[in-house]
């Protein structure tokens, strides 16, 4: 019998193969690379063990997964694909983009909106969400992750999906409040990141770990799962411990709020307004929170 050839044969063969049963070299995940620490990425590629998540973190991740699925269901008729895979073997990077949105001309308010957009969904605690909202820009690592998707999808699909940019959609996991930002391709930024990846891969091939790490003041050192084996991270934490302490924003906000509430309660009890103190409206105006 003549062997079948062509696309139909390819699909038949593909469906007889379990991709998870095939031996695979470790690859870099976009979310890991987006952290900006190439030593962290190197540890992952080497398969260094991480401590298990505690139950609370597991529940938080589960909430994020549920939010992703809900948002994807809402957009299923507006996306050409969800969990869109890409792989770039030269840099050992692969991943799944949350979705590729298509805005049809008849649905666009402006002509510039029409076209294909990569989607990235992020769930955040209320305090983190408020910071992003107040800043008016997405977090640096989320911008970097969006750039990786734009580049990776372009490489893997060879430009057949002409992505105009990416949309980073934030959702407050406590209130379901939301906001979104547009991110456009930045060839210079992605070229710099890929050069760092190439240097890291070349070093690993020669048995060397990279010295491309986050600055000592970066908050991520305290949450790194590799801190026990990471000398730069341990030095960074030692440096942070001797720096002058400042009151965390959330703690300061709680203190101010409690004092204002106590003052209002005292006024209600005595029937007279206490002198000297500022109202919440005065404070908000002074701190430009309005």
Task: Give the residues covered by each predicted segment.
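Structured loops at beta-to-helix junctions and adjacent beta-edge loops in soluble globular domains
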Residues: 44-45, 122, 171, 227
């Amino acid at each position: 019998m003549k062997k079948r050839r062509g696309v139909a044969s390819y699909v038949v063969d593909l469906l007889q193969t379990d991709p998870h049963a095939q031996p695979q070299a470790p690859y870099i995940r976009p979310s890991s690379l987006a952290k900006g620490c190439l030593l962290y990425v190197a540890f992952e590629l080497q398969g260094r063990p991480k401590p298990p998540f505690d139950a609370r973190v597991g529940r938080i991740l589960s909430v994020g997964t549920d939010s992703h699925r809900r948002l994807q269901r809402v957009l299923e008729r507006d996306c050409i694909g969800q969990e869109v895979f890409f792989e770039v073997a030269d840099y050992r990077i692969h991943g799944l983009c949350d979705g590729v949105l298509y805005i049809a001309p008849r649905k666009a308010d402006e002509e510039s909106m029409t076209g294909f957009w990569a989607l990235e969904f992020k769930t955040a605690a209320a305090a983190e969400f408020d910071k992003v909202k107040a800043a008016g820009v997405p977090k640096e690592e989320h911008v970097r992750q969006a750039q990786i998707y734009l580049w990776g999808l372009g490489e893997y699909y060879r430009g057949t999906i002409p992505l105009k940019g990416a949309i980073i959609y934030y959702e407050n996991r406590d209130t379901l409040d939301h906001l979104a930002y547009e991110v456009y391709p930045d060839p210079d930024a992605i070229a710099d990141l890929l050069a760092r990846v190439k240097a890291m891969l070349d070093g690993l091939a020669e048995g060397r770990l990279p010295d491309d790490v986050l600055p000592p003041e970066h908050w991520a050192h305290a949450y790194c799962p590799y801190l026990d084996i990471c000398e730069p991270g341990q030095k960074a934490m030692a440096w942070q411990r001797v720096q002058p302490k400042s009151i965390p924003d959330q703690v300061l906000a709680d203190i101010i709020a409690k004092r204002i509430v106590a003052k209002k309660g005292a006024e209600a009890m005595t029937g007279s307004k206490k002198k000297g103190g500022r109202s919440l409206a005065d404070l908000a105006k002074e701190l430009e929170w309005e």
